[in-house]
């Protein structure tokens, strides 16, 4: 099936599943829960069913394993969610998509170029475990490949990827995580592939290590420190002598 058809179906799925969320920009609230966000597109039977709170994912339904996956295991102890509910919503989305496809004018969707940023989770210390985060925004349609490279070689160990998060403009964003141990010998890239890009985009990251001081710089710093110390000694000595002289003059007996 050509790419344009896949894009048509992606846009129809998005319109069908999210049209009921309209008008949210007019509502002000301290907290926002998005329950049962369902996205389905074809070909490939691609879909997801998620629960979000204040933009953070609480859980999603694994469509292949047919089970609920909680972002934090502790949440599963507080409540339960039967994955069958999510699977039913996906089936409904697929059915609606097929109907809308037959009634559509087959206008191709527009591929948006996603934007990627790479940053560490914590301040970087060489030899200390850390996590790299690749944040990819402005994704549409929600089909994307995110790959980690270390020294230009693909990395699969320690990689975790979130589901798609829906933005207010109905584009999507996604995060990919890589656990690693920073080393001054390693460089990393987050590789992003999407229909909106003419070629894959690589977002580069490497630890910023302060350059060592040269011998000349060390000599200059030591000389400046020594000079400041000598000036301090001289100035201090002058003040002490002046103080002694002033004290001697005040103690000299005056005329009777």
From Swiss-Prot:
Cellular localisation: Membrane
GO molecular function: peptide antigen binding
Endpoints of the signal sequence: 1-23
Entry membrane topology: Single-pass type I membrane protein
Residue ranges of domain Ig-like C1-type in the record: 114-206
Glycan attachment positions: 105, 145
Main location: membrane
Residues exposed to the Cytoplasmic side: 242-256
PROSITE patterns in the record: IG_LIKE, IG_MHC
This protein's UniProt keywords: Adaptive immunity, Disulfide bond, Glycoprotein, Immunity, Membrane, MHC II, Signal, Transmembrane, Transmembrane helix
Listed Pfam families: C1-set (PF07654), MHC_II_alpha (PF00993)
Disulfide bonds listed in the record: 134-190
Residues annotated as transmembrane: 219-241
SUPFAM superfamilies: Immunoglobulin, MHC antigen-recognition domain
Entries under SMART domains matching the protein: IGc1, MHC_II_alpha
Ranges in the topological domain labelled Extracellular: 24-218
Start and end residues of each stretch annotated as Alpha-1: 24-111
Annotated GO biological process: adaptive immune response; antigen processing and presentation; antigen processing and presentation of exogenous peptide antigen via MHC class II; antigen processing and presentation of peptide antigen; positive regulation of T cell differentiation
Region (Alpha-2): 112-205
PANTHER family (alphabetical): HLA CLASS II HISTOCOMPATIBILITY ANTIGEN, DQ ALPHA 1 CHAIN, MHC CLASS II-RELATED
Family: Belongs to the MHC class II family.
Record-given protein name: H-2 class II histocompatibility antigen, A-K alpha chain
Taxonomic source organism: Mus musculus
Gene designation: H2-Aa
């Amino acid at each position: 099936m050509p790419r344009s058809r896949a894009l048509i179906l992606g846009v129809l799925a998005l319109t069908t599943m999210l049209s009921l969320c309209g008008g949210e920009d007019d509502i002000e609230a301290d907290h926002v829960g998005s329950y049962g966000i369902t996205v389905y597109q074809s070909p490939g039977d691609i879909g997801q069913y998620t629960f979000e709170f204040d933009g953070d994912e609480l859980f999603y339904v694994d469509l292949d394993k047919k089970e609920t996956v909680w972002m934090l295991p502790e949440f599963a102890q507080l409540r339960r969610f039967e994955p069958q509910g999510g699977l039913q919503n996906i089936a409904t989305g697929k059915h609606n998509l097929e109907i809308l496809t037959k009634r559509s004018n087959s206008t191709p969707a527009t591929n948006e170029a996603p934007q990627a940023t790479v940053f560490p989770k914590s301040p970087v210390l060489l030899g200390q475990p850390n996590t790299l985060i690749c944040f990819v925004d402005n994704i549409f349609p929600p089909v994307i490949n995110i790959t980690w490279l270390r020294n230009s070689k693909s990395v699969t160990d320690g990689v975790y990827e979130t589901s798609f998060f829906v933005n207010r403009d109905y584009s999507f964003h996604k995060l990919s995580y890589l656990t690693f141990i920073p080393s001054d010998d390693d460089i990393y890239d987050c590789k992003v592939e999407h229909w909106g890009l003419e070629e894959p985009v690589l977002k580069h990251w490497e630890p910023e290590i302060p350059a060592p001081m040269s011998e000349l710089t060390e000599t200059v710093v030591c000389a400046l420190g020594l000079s400041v110390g000598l000036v301090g000694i001289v100035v201090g000595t002058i003040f002490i002598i002046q103080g002694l002289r002033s004290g001697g003059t005040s103690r000299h007996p005056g005329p009777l």
